[in-house]
């Protein structure tokens, strides 16, 4: 008999504070999937790494949505995972100490592994 695994959604975010709507929708969708009992991994690459950087994520607001900080905190509290591209943070002179609690710095191998295990991968 096949295993009955939960759905897994990987959401890749490449936009940061410069595009607050795309940045916010990443976490709206992640929280919605968690509410539906899916496993969720948010991958932050390129400017998306700012969404898990102290001093940035607290100041992202998109019209019609909850503040990004509230959505990020909710995603982590509900059991979602946030992984952050190490080369991307290094290119932006962001240290791992500047990442929010719960954000995991990772390299390409981990990201590819998460994607290969996913039921669905989307990008914002």
What are the language-model segments listed below?
Residues 23-38, 42:
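Histidine-anchored nucleotide/phosphate-binding helix
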Residues 11-24, 56:
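Short, glycine-rich nucleotide/cofactor-binding loops
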Residues 40-45, 82-86:
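Short internal beta-strands
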Residues 59-86:
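A glycine-rich helix N-cap at a beta->alpha junction
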Residues 48-62:
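N-terminal beta-loop-helix "entrance" segment that forms/cooperates
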Residues 91-94, 98-117, 122-123:
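C-terminal structural segments of small proteins and small subunits
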Residues 1-5:
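Basic/polar N-terminal segments that are highly enriched at the extreme N-terminus
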Residues 58-63, 98-102:
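Short, flexible loop segments at the rims of nucleotide/cofactor-binding pockets, characterized by
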């Amino acid at each position: 008999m096949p295993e009955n695994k939960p759905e897994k959604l990987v959401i890749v975010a490449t936009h940061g504070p410069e595009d607050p709507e795309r940045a916010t929708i990443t976490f709206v969708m992640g929280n919605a999937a968690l509410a539906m009992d899916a496993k969720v991994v948010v991958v932050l690459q390129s400017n998306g790494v700012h969404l898990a950087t102290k001093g940035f994520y607290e100041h992202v607001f998109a019209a019609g949505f909850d503040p990004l900080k509230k959505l990020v905190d909710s995603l982590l509290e509900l059991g979602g995972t946030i992984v952050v591209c190490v080369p991307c943070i290094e290119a932006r002179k962001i240290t791992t100490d500047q990442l929010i609690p719960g954000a995991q710095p990772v390299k390409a191998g981990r990201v590819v592994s998460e994607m290969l295990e996913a039921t669905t991968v989307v990008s914002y």
